[in-house]
Amino acid sequence: MFNKIIVFGSVILLLASSCHQTAQQETTRSQEDFKKIDFHAHYRHDREYLLPLLDKWNMQALLIDVAKEDTARNRSQWEALKAQYSKYPDRFFLCASFESSNIDDPSFADKIIAKLENDFANGARMVKVWKVHGMVTRDGSGKFIQIDDPRIQPVWDFLTEKKVPVIAHIGEPLQAWLPLQEGNPHAGYYRDHPEYHAYNFPEIPAWETIMAARDNWIAKNPNLTIVAAHMGSMSHDLDLVAERLDKYPNMLVETAARWPDIVLQDPEKVRNFFLKYQDRVMYGTDFEIDTPFDPSKKEDDMGRRDNMDKRFGLHWEYLSGNDSLFFDRGSFKTHTHSINLPDSVLRKFYYENAMGVLTGE
């Protein structure tokens, strides 16, 4: 009897050891084994560290143009992105953009379509629309131009026919309509960019108004693939994001510049969100290189490189680990717990969903 107890106990220990090893394998994975696409980047200029850093993280990137207004500066930024793409076509994907300041022109839509056709001929696979729709640009009557304005509809019809997806940064985090709150993840941005702090400009439409216009636009274009950038400007509450994903099957989201909002929420809630919508969420950072190389600022450049590397690592630890985590993003710091997503979900989030959007497959 005593011998049987010893044998039985040994079996239990062996099973426990096996389970522990399995759990370890699931939570100590190597990021190099996971292909990645940063679905939201602005590398307008090259650096000697850029490709080695992306190699380290097994990463490609979508280079996104941002049309704020019809200016020579905006056009030069697009030329810079095209040059980057031409230099590294196996590393980068290209995303064009347009804005609507000339919406009163009767041939507005035709001119935008002609521009986009030229952009596609130069390699663009997507189109970006920015928060100037709803918050900045007005028509001749002084009315803010919302993204669901009927005068833009011919452009959406054209993109639907061409099967070209759109990435839309519409609106801002809710914080933009509130007084600056120290400790809020967005306080630094609105301190540095007061022109987008809607709280100071009561004439800017309410957050709810802009979100309603965005939702109406998505509903009116059910056959157009729409990626709502920055978690759809609803990153403070994943329940709001989930509500839209349930309602609009043509909508996806990406995480660029909204990681602090995400990690502030309950880790179990976040994990369940990523599991439920594993086919609809993509990785994004909003990292940029906005100026040509200046040898006198090489130290600043290397600081940027180290910051990018650190944040890539933080994102990976949060998603793949299974332990408490100090999420330190410089001006924003918090304690949380990583969410230990399965390999299959990580592969979709980091790569497969993005490739599906970019290739239409």
Stretches found by the model and what they are:
Residues 27-29, 77-198, 202, 249-252, ...:
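Active-site gating/metal-coordination segments in enzymes
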